[in-house]
Structures are given as structure tokens and as C-alpha cells.
């Protein structure tokens, strides 16, 4: 594992989630007012507003009907791939890597990017603050895919490491 230093600007969060429930927004304000440091061993991962938008759009397109946890797990896959030696080390490159996310090729991503829910943004911020699962690298809908070792099913998605 690597050390991840994240700086999340409060203004970016509030801009992205202006209609979020006040209690959640208040909690996030407290959690993002200063530098967030996640201890994992060795490098800094700079997360831009564009990265956050991309991850939220993927979460929306791939797990729009899977609830907050389903979206968080999709974001985990992206972040875990960034950390993996087997995938590109940047969020945008992971997302646009050929044949990885169905929504990129079927038009779902383009539809989602203009209509990202507050819940999808919350999933991204929650995972940046505290990952749900550090091991999952793949997911498919309907059954376990041909890649990776099956780990578990969450609603309609099957996750592998």
C-alpha cells in the first residue's frame, strides 16, 4: 500500500453537492476543512475536480441503481486500479483504458456526466476519505467475469480481486 495525501477543497465539494442534505454537508464540511492524510506507504495521489467528476460519473453510470454502497464499491475499483501496478497510475487513464468500463463504450457515461447525482459525489468523497475495500479490481453485472478471483456479490454486481 502507498501513502495517499489528499487535499479536498471544501468549495469544490459544496459546488458539486449544493442540493445535498444539510446534515451530510455539515459532516463533510468538518471532514474536509483541512488536509486529509490517509496513511498507506509511499506516494501522493493528487485528486482534481475533474477526477472527482469522472469518478462520480462512472459511479452514476455503472451503479446508478445500486445505492450508495454500490457506487462506493465502483469508486473503490477505480482507486484500487490507480494503486495497482497492473493498471495506469492515474484516475483518468484508468477510466478511459479500453474495454474496462461498459458505460464508456455504450454511451452511459456521456448521459451520466451531465446528470450526476449527489449520491454519486458522496460515494467518491466517502471513498477518498475511507476506502470500503482495498482489494477489488474488477466488477461485472450478472455473474463473475473471466478476470480476477471472485470475492463477493453486492446487489447486481460481482466483484473480483
Model region roles, listed by residue range:
Residues 1, 23-27, 49:
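Low-complexity, intrinsically disordered regions enriched in charged/polar residues
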Residues 16-34:
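Sec-dependent signal peptide cleavage junction
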Residues 2-22:
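Sec-dependent N-terminal signal peptides of Gram-positive bacterial secreted proteins and lipoproteins
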Residues 29-161:
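Bacterial extracytoplasmic/cell-wall-associated proteins, especially those involved in peptidoglycan
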